[in-house]
Amino acid sequence: MKKVLMGISVAMLLAACGTTSTNGANTTNTTAQTPQTTQQVHVEVKTDGAYTVKEYDFESNGKNLYARAFVPEVEGRVPLVIFSHGLGANVEHEEEVQKALAKAGIAVFSFEFAGGSSSSAPMSEGLTTEMSVLTEVQNLKDAIRIASGMEYVDPQKIYLMGSSQGGLVTALTAEEVTNIAGLFLFYPAFSLPDDIRSSFPK
């Protein structure tokens, strides 16, 4: 059932984004005041001939974060989906969905939250004990600013996607930024605030 729902979600996303590229040079701004952020492309690998895999490092809240993008091999600018993983996951979370979008002509920028991965070898800096929904909101704001400025991105077609805790973070962030074309949330953890209150009553 989960795969069926994912397939339906991807189909809806494809319909919403469209895959027509554009050569426009507009920029996307966020209302958030974020720290100075840097980007560095350090790897570029061809995959399947349908897309290029690019890896990035950028800074958020004083932590170095790892990001990976699937960029379609097409001319001009393309729609962009910025993906936020769930608690304890990483950029490979829902990877098949990311690849399917890239093969359909939609770029996907996925990053690892600071302290948000339970991997024994996390790609981003930060401790789990230092991570919260609010720190992840800031991470996503910085990711939006970085990704929206990429040369292959159509700034009028930037979408946010998140799953589980990443879905909650995506929804909260969308309330504070501008020029986001749409949201796609997979089983968002909207119950998390109530769960925490019930676990730690006053």
Where do the model's predicted regions map?
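Alpha/beta-hydrolase fold nucleophile elbow
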Residues: 152-163
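Hydrolase active-site cap/lid region
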Residues: 172-202
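Active-site glycine-rich loops that stabilize anionic/oxyanionic intermediates
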Residues: 78, 84-89
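The serine-hydrolase catalytic nucleophile loop
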Residues: 88-99, 113
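Conserved alpha/beta-hydrolase
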Residues: 101-122
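N-terminal cap/lid segment of alpha/beta-hydrolase-fold proteins
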Residues: 36-74
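C-terminal motif of bacterial Sec signal peptides marking the signal peptidase cleavage site
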Residues: 15-16
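Alpha/beta-hydrolase active-site loop
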Residues: 129-151
